[in-house]
Amino acid sequence: MKILLLKCGDICYDGVVIMLRNILKYMDKTGMEIWLYANGRVADREIADEFSNMGIILVTGGQDGLDDEKTSADIRRLCRAERFDIVHCNTGNNRFSGIALMAARAGGNAVRIAHSHNTNGADKTYSAKANVFRRINRELAHVHLACSASAADHLFGAGCKHIIIRNGIDTAHFKYDEKIRNEIRSALGIPDDTILIGNIGKMINQKNQEFLLNVMSVLKKRQIASRLMILGEGALREMLELQISSLGLMDEVLLPGNIDDIAPYLNAMDVFAMPSVFEGLPVAAVEAQAAGLPVILSDVISRETDLTGNVTFLSLAEGCEKWADSILEASKRKREDTSIRVLEKGFDIRHTASVLRKMYIKIYDKRKGRIK
């Protein structure tokens, strides 16, 4: 069975890449030849090597943005040359998904899967064409998958029949451990009486981390002992560093960069905050809940993200003062082991990988005429 996975953008530490990495890590790949095409570049060699070490054949388009013609040509060429059985497009970008599905159809007769990972696209220039691409995604995909109901509505339009694929994690690995918490906080120089606010995500406009810096400025003015730690890298790092300097937050903000194993750092945090301007069902928020953290999310994020009852949704329009209030309130909650709640909601990565493998096999067997 030959499978082509597609994703928009670079091979980097973003949500889709991490989700694919985790699924493939835990999937039984016996009898499968899996390719991964990204229309961007290899931005993080370490995670690219992880795919290669799992036997995944990695192909990149070398684009800095979304070049429709080149993306289409790349996918058509791959499909014609390799004759894939399944083409599985993973994105929250309507435009990329539509282009990819049209190219896959032109390039062969593979079964086409469209998988929505977001509730909105970052490219506002093409927002007027969203309904056109939704129709393309709905009609050209044989199988419609999504991480949440709102993500499905975004990519396919309301009312389209779809299957939910949970953004699973290794719940046992993220279980809260006070010993690890103390070790990491000591290594970071975080005193016991200091609130450590955490955020994980690529430094791009979508993640809206500049908003958190303004929240930190509010906390500093209130003389609240607090720190902010943002895990990740991205194009906006320099801008964030300038903002940190202009707000006088050099001693309050930590930017460790990309961290392969974030579980120990989640243990060290007191509150997890994600003021994104759009998301699907973010893996980082699932991981934070498995680690027992109270979570503050912008209200554009799917309510399906609340797995533990310890999630607060706030509008960005409520402003930094309100966000600061909510963070302070959340930091007073007793830390508990909530990993089992996340597991019980079906967000275990082993289950996710098993569900997807069974789906691939069923599609392949039906394609080969083994089942009706």
Where are these predicted regions, by residue range?
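Nucleotide-activated donor-binding/catalytic signature segment of Leloir-type glycosyltransferases, i.e.
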Residues: 241-257
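Aromatic "clamp/platform" in nucleotide-sugar-dependent glycosyltransferases that forms part
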Residues: 258, 277
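Short hydrophobic beta-strand element within catalytic cores of glycosyltransferases
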Residues: 285, 294-298, 303
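Donor nucleotide-sugar binding/catalytic pocket of nucleotide-sugar-dependent glycosyltransferases
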Residues: 140-179, 313
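A conserved mid-protein helix/loop that constitutes part of the nucleotide-sugar donor-binding site
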Residues: 14-22, 195, 199-218, 235-241
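A charged, aromatic-enriched C-terminal amphipathic alpha-helix characteristic of glycosyltransferases
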Residues: 173, 334-371
